[in-house]
Structure formats: structure tokens, C-alpha cells
């Protein structure tokens, strides 16, 4: 059975490249978040976590930061979902390169926008639920989401 074999050596390089792409997107997201913070609340850091919470929740600038930050974060999450929803399973399952894996993922999302949007919401809900108990729940949520992603990939790509 293909799912039980160890990672093929040719796939390791492609998986590494895909990971680096996602790492670059993460770095861009951090830069965007820092920029949004600076533009809305100013360049100075708060003196405490409670001061930060007060500034964010009780000022117009704080609510602007929340709204803009959530919108930008949603766009980053959407890009990550689109390029990676079937990329990693495809790289593990077949001998394809990163470009083809990303193109296949984009095509899968384009051809199945409703189910893929639902899957994105399920992933988000699973991660939130796993994070609530001091991140310990992620030890349960991540393997379940990974297994379900494999089945989604098999159903969508075949």
C-alpha cells in the first residue's frame, strides 16, 4: 500500500521546497501584521499585555487593527489553503514536482470551491478547538486533520 511506504527520496526535496514556500508566506504574514500594528497603533510597543489588550479592545485604532489584521490574515490563509490543500499528499503519493503539485492544488480548489471552502473552515475550527486547551488538543487535532486531508486528496485527485 502506497500510504504505508516511507517517504520517497525524490519527494523530500519537493516537500522541503513546499515547506520553504509556506515559511516565506509565514514571514510575509508576520511582516504584514507588524506593518498593520505600526500603522494602526503606532511604532511603540505596549508596556504590558494588559495595556495591549486595553489599547486593542477600547480604541478605534485597536478595532481597526483587528479588522484589517483579520482581513489580511484571511487572505494569507486562503493563499496557503489554495496552494497546499492537495500539494503535500500529492508530493507524497506521486512523483511530481512542486510546480505541478501547486498547480494541481489550485485546479482542485477552482473546480471544487464550495467543498474546499468548507474544508478550510473545518481546518480552522479544528485548529481553534485544538488550541483552546493550552495547545495540547493539537496533539489530537493535527493527526485527525492530516488523515482527513489524505482522504480529501484521494477523493479529489484520485
What are these regions (language model features)?
Residues 1-158:
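Hydrophobic alpha-helical membrane segments
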Amino acid at each position: 500500500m502506497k500510504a504505508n511506504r516511507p517517504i520517497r527520496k525524490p519527494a523530500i526535496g519537493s516537500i522541503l521546497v513546499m515547506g520553504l514556500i509556506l515559511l516565506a508566506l509565514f514571514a510575509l504574514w508576520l511582516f504584514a501584521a507588524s506593518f498593520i500594528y505600526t500603522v494602526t497603533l503606532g511604532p511603540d510597543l505596549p508596556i504590558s499585555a494588559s495595556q495591549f489588550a486595553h489599547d486593542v479592545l477600547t480604541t478605534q485604532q485597536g478595532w481597526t487593527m483587528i479588522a484589517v489584521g483579520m482581513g489580511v490574515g484571511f487572505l494569507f490563509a486562503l493563499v496557503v489553503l489554495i496552494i497546499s490543500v492537495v500539494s503535500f499528499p500529492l508530493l507524497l503519493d506521486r512523483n511530481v514536482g512542486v510546480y505541478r503539485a501547486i498547480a494541481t492544488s489550485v485546479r482542485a480548489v477552482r473546480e471544487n470551491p464550495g467543498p474546499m471552502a468548507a474544508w478550510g473552515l473545518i481546518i480552522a475550527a479544528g485548529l481553534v478547538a485544538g488550541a483552546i486547551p493550552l495547545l495540547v488538543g493539537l496533539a489530537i487535532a493535527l493527526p485527525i486533520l492530516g488523515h482527513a486531508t489524505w482522504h480529501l486528496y484521494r477523493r479529489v485527485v484520485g
